[in-house]
Amino acid sequence: TVMAVFFMSQVVSAQTSEWKEKTEFHKIMSQTFHSAEEGNFAPIKSRIDEMETKAVAFKNSEIPADFGNKDAIKKSLKKLVKETKAFNKKIKSGASDEALKNDFMALHDTFHTIVGLCKAEDEHEH
């Protein structure tokens, strides 16, 4: 799966400007989400502080100049940070894996919303 993630990230990178903070957040998401889907929440539990730090850095970073949808990206980044912080609190409170599952899915969906918005202004959907 590491190779698949690597190749997928290369395809995404080829389509749009590099955004280091997006890549760093994605790395943690990809390394923790798939194991959680299979019922193993240990990776995200051990890396949630790192994920929160990366989410805040992602929100505070400069959106690449050629991206359109900047307002929508900013709004979604705020949501990502809010959801990551809430997820961290839930993990720290000792919530069951079952209780964490839906929150992690929502966080994953929010990240993919951001990825979908990250297009150069001259790229059009057909």
Stretches with model-predicted labels:
Residues 1-17:
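Bacterial Sec-dependent N-terminal signal peptides
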